[in-house]
Amino acid sequence: MRCEILSVGTELLLGDILNTNAQYLSRRLADLGIPVYFHTTVGDNPERLKKALEIAFSRSDMVIATGGLGPTQDDLTKEISAEFFNKKLVLHEESLKRIKEFFERRGLNLTEGNIKQAYIIEGSRVIPNDWGTAPGIILEEGGKILILLPGPPKEMIPMFETYVVPYLSTFSSGIIYSKVLRVCGIGESFMEEKVKDLIKSQTNPTIAPYAKEGEAILRITARAKSKEEAEKMIEGVVKEIRKRLGDYIYGEGETSLEEVVVNLLLEKGLTISVAESCTGGLISARLVNVPGVSKVFKGSIIAYDNEVKIKELNVPEEIFKEYGAVSSQCAMKMAEGIAKKMGTDVGLSATGIAGPEGGTLEKPIGLVYIGLYIRGEMSYKELRLSGDRNRIRLYTTINGLDLLRRGLLNL
């Protein structure tokens, strides 16, 4: 069965909203063994929406459309879909009852637009919406399947999981299962070179490399009759990849670099503080994304000005005179200074030239030094980054966390 995901909403075309629904649905459909062949995005325009449906059903057996089920005049997915299949819209009394109760519980007045949401395509089955007002629809017609779901992810995802997944499970023959390995410290091309022969030789499982900002990803995917069988197929491939990439692999699945770092600190019973210059708090922000970080993270100082580095971090003035603020010597002293000031086992620092001004031939834009202090031992990493200011700061943050990870692994 060929499936197509149709995302409806002018806001998606304008880039005002990130299309996370399509990403989510593609992943889940793959888990169910239903291949997605096309993604289409169309605005809230009746003619273009109808054309999108025509194209979708000319090449796909099933179309899952999200968005355009709301109460406003430009929410037309249901109406255009009914027109496409030459069907009428009919009032679904149970949905109307649920919508009325939804508004009564909140002390709100029901509008004509909300009543419109209770209409469904003739001959379709309703997908109840226990998280909002717009019910979904499943329509089987002429060997084709149309599934309509609301656009808000907080409604779409639970509706899909609760009601659509059981329906779709009857169509899947086997499953597609993937495992993701997350890599840091090497670029996508270098990583791919390390496993190039595996990528070429593997057909099931397959190995696909992807680039992510400052990181790289390897997705290993197997098609099998069951999840257990797929996991066994993947296991040997993952073992060989780990053998080749070693500690460049920092995690699996949705694990973030900062989660790995915080878990290492917790495991080793260490505390950390951070001194930041060019990153301006980005490293600290990433750390505090992790629940439970308060057990290991004591605080940070944004020491942008040299005077702050001297007074707050105890960086000797001679460092600036002899080496400058952007130097390995300064980075290490910043890391040592913050650790001693905060009374932590570990200190991490970053100093560099993020641009667009301030670079010289000797010290160009993108030159960054990351300092690491762990219980009296100091080390550093030099980076020569390219791109705009935001990219340099982001890559510095990622490399800083990775240097910290490696330092902790070596303890």
Curated annotation (Swiss-Prot):
Q: Which domain of life is it from?
A: Bacteria
| Record-linked SUPFAM superfamilies | CinA-like (SSF142433), Molybdenum cofactor biosynthesis proteins (SSF53218)
Matching entries from CDD domains are given as:
cinA
Q: Which Pfam families match?
A: CinA, CinA_KH, MoCF_biosynth
Q: Which family does it belong to?
A: Belongs to the CinA family.
- HAMAP family, per this entry? CinA_B
Name it: CinA-like protein
Kindly list the organism's lineage: Bacteria, Pseudomonadati, Dictyoglomota, Dictyoglomia, Dictyoglomales
